Regions:
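Short amphipathic alpha-helices and their capping/turn segments at secondary-structure boundaries
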Residues: 18-39, 62-75
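A basic- and aromatic-enriched beta-loop-alpha substructure that forms the phosphate/nucleotide-
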Residues: 34-57
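Alpha-helical elements of Rossmann-like donor-binding domains used by nucleotide-donor carbohydrate transfer enzymes
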Residues: 20, 24-27, 106, 136, ...
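C-terminal accessory "lid"/substrate-recognition subdomains
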Residues: 115-122, 129-164
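Hydrophobic helix-cap positions at the C-terminus of alpha-helices
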Residues: 28, 32, 110, 114, ...
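Short loop/turn segments at strand-loop or loop-helix junctions that form parts
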Residues: 1, 42-45, 80-85
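Conserved substrate/cofactor phosphate-moiety recognition/catalytic segment
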Residues: 1-26
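A glycine- and Lys/Arg-enriched "phosphate-lid" helix/loop adjacent to the NTP-binding pocket
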Residues: 55-132
Length: 164
């Protein structure tokens, strides 16, 4: 979502830019939610809310806190990656360690009030390698698969979106 923000991002973002990101995130999730059984995002609205709070010194000038709180209820699981790896230039994400730490401090403060502990899994980013056991996280989310006989694999059709 952030890649398409016409109003600024990262350290230069304005409150309006962060509001745009929150609304665009929700809009995109609404559009995609009926296209698949499971939707995985690399950022949740609560992350974007943390960026908004940073731009406003902790204030909520658009009164989106209730919307963000309610929208967090639509997620079955949150996997928080603790940023313990060096920042890399990718043309979008900030490489400013201080900025990253400010966002992490805000998340440390707000996550407990937005996300129930039983739906939050915290993992150090350095643990995410080719050998990381994503299967156990999926099992935690959906449960162990039942033994099924004569299961026929269904084809998957990917439909590009505006965001692809």
């Amino acid at each position: 979502v952030i890649r398409f923000n016409p109003l600024g991002l990262n350290e230069g973002a304005t409150p309006e830019a962060q509001l745009w990101v929150i609304m665009a995130q929700i809009q995109q999730e609404l559009e995609l939610r009926n296209r698949a059984e499971m939707l995985v995002t690399d950022r949740a609205v609560v992350d974007n809310f943390a960026y908004l709070l940073r731009t406003t010194g902790g204030e909520d000038p658009f009164s989106v806190r209730p919307l963000v709180r309610r929208w967090c209820e639509t997620y079955d699981m949150f996997v928080r990656l603790l940023p313990d790896v060096p920042l890399k230039v990718d043309g979008v994400r900030s490489t400013n360690t201080r900025f990253r730490n400010e966002i992490e401090q805000i998340l440390d403060t707000i996550l407990p009030s937005f996300i129930p502990e039983d739906r939050l899994i915290t993992v150090r980013a350095s643990e995410i390698t080719e050998r990381f056991d994503w299967g156990s996280l999926i099992e935690r989310l959906v449960g162990l698969p039942e033994e099924a006989e004569n299961v026929v694999a269904q084809p998957v059709t990917l439909i590009p979106t505006l965001w692809d």
